[in-house]
A protein has these predicted regions:
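Glycine-rich active-site loop/strand segments that organize a redox cofactor
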Residues: 49-80
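Core beta-strand elements of the Rossmann-like FAD/NAD(P) dinucleotide-binding domain
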Residues: 2-4, 172-182, 345-346
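Glycine-rich loop(s) and the adjacent beta-strand/alpha-helix scaffold that form part
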Residues: 182-235, 241, 371, 375
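An anion/pyrophosphate-binding glycine-rich loop and adjacent beta-alpha core
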Residues: 36, 210, 216-316, 384
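A glycine-rich dinucleotide-binding beta-alpha-beta segment and adjacent secondary-structure elements
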Residues: 147-148, 153-168, 303-357
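Conserved redox-cofactor binding core of oxidoreductases
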Residues: 94-174, 186, 230-234, 254
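Glycine- and aromatic-enriched mobile tails/lids
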Residues: 1-4, 13, 21, 27, ...
């Protein structure tokens, strides 16, 4: 048995930021299914939204709701927007290097669905810049232990209270984790379930499956975002390469097989995706074209160096020709149902990031709200855990010895003898849950 105060599953931006906002006198165990740099947070290209000033509040709020088809939780949206400046200040304090204008002011870009430029960025690798910086700050903390290539297999709970987890360690052995305070699920989305996805393949919705297994409430499981533009390939690949929405925000256009523009590129993602699929069907093609030559060359060079290089490796010169793009699964709006402090319906269990759903995105996420939402509500989870730890919201619970005894009593090694079967079962549980939500919604 591994003992800790707080157990965080996942080392993406939400898990890392949560850890940074927890007390330094708490022992924190973090695990990640792959290595610490293989989280989808690293893959976010476009940027992170921020409320530039109060005059932008109404339009930012409306843009978020419009993209979400007005099914968003309005309080969640308000919290996210109102907290954005605080989060950005934290990130800059940690050392995140956002782009600046020539006069030293923060530079903003625009993406689909936004009525104004309000997105901060670092070249076309904003997620990597943020997540790598947060990881470096976490690695400086003596109270945090990170175990790589360690997967959460199950939680240990009784009477709707979580006491620990079951993990598969790097050497393939099974162990248990018992925690004194709380557990945080920050284990990403479900892209690994799809043939074409921008996500890492190991992200298969383990947290969602565990929630289904233990009766933890879920929300909007069928709300799955398809990104309009990933680089087309006729060969099998680990994941689809994203062509950031900010490329279109800077002026790139979408073209049909006759090299004619066929849609407004700055509509919300689901609308642009539908337009592309319709055009592909009309043209009888497996992709449409995206032309970056409408953007000044210096902007492309400075803002999108990673995209330029990846396209070059694939045989495309974005300066002289359009590139083929196709929609692919990208983001999971649904998840484990949480309140505005990221608490699930099970005691001692929190969920943040793409694993969680507080309704902030509605049916369809507005571009560059994902990193922000993950950070805002991860910090709120940490603050709630802090408050509970000092007794501000204390609920009578078993003492540490009793908690350990409960974990030992409930853990049955024979239940985890066939891990490959468990993994397959979990995948099917998530897919079945998606179908169930669709049926209940009449889709």
């Amino acid at each position: 048995m591994i003992e800790t105060d707080i157990f965080i599953v996942g080392t993406g931006c939400s898990g890392l930021y949560c850890a940074l906002n927890l007390p330094r006198d708490k022992q924190i165990l973090m695990i990640t299914k792959s290595d610490v740099r293989s989280s989808d947070s690293y893959l976010a290209q476009g940027g992170i939204c921020v409320l530039k000033d109060e005059s932008d509040y109404d339009s930012y709020f409306e843009d978020t709701l419009k993209a979400g088809h007005y099914e968003n939780n309005k309080e969640s949206v308000d919290i996210m927007i109102r907290t954005s400046q605080e989060v950005i200040s934290d990130l800059i304090g940690y050392g995140v290097d956002f782009e600046h204008t020539t006069d030293g002011e923060l530079a903003y870009t625009r993406e689909g669905g936004h009525s104004d430029k309000r997105i901060l960025f670092h070249e076309d690798e904003t997620g990597e810049e943020i997540t790598h910086t947060l990881l470096n700050r976490v690695l400086e903390l003596p109270n945090v232990t990170i175990l790589e290539r360690t997967a959460l297999i199950d939680i240990i709970e009784e009477n709707n209270t979580c006491y620990g987890g079951v993990i598969k360690k790097e050497d393939g052995t099974i162990d248990t984790v018992a925690f004194r305070d709380d557990m945080v699920l920050a284990c990403g989305g479900i892209g690994g379930l799809y043939k074409h996805s921008t996500n890492f393949r190991h992200l298969t919705g383990d947290g969602i499956a565990i929630a289904v297994k233990h009766g933890i409430e879920r929300q909007d499981i069928d709300y799955i975002q398809i990104h309009p533009t990933t680089l087309y390939s006729d060969k099998p690949q680990d994941r689809s390469f994203l062509i950031s929405e900010s490329v279109r925000g800077e002026g790139a256009v979408l073209l049909d097989k006759n090299m004619e523009r066929f849609t407004d590129e700055l509509q919300p993602r689901d609308v642009v995706t539908a337009a592309i699929r319709k055009q592909m069907k009309l043209d009888g093609t497996e992709f449409v074209w995206e032309d970056l030559r409408t953007i000044p060359k210096d902007v492309v060079e400075n803002h999108f160096p990673n995209i330029v290089e990846h396209c070059k490796q694939r045989g495309f010169d974005v300066y002289t020709e359009p590139i083929p793009v196709v929609p692919a699964q990208h983001y999971f709006m649904g998840g484990i149902k949480v309140d505005h402090n990221s608490a699930t319906t099970m005691n001692n269990l929190y969920a943040v990031g793409e694993t969680a759903c507080n309704g902030v995105h509605g049916v369809n996420r507005l571009a560059s709200n994902s990193l922000l939402e993950s950070l805002v509500f991860a910090k709120r989870a940490a603050h709630k855990i802090n408050a509970d730890a000092v007794g501000l919201n204390a609920v009578p619970e078993p003492n540490w010895g009793e908690r350990q005894a409960i974990v030992n009593k409930l853990f049955k090694p024979e239940d985890y003898a066939d891990l490959s079967q468990i993994e397959n079962d979990y995948r099917q549980m998530v897919l079945d849950e998606i179908d169930k939500f669709k049926e209940e919604r009449g889709k």
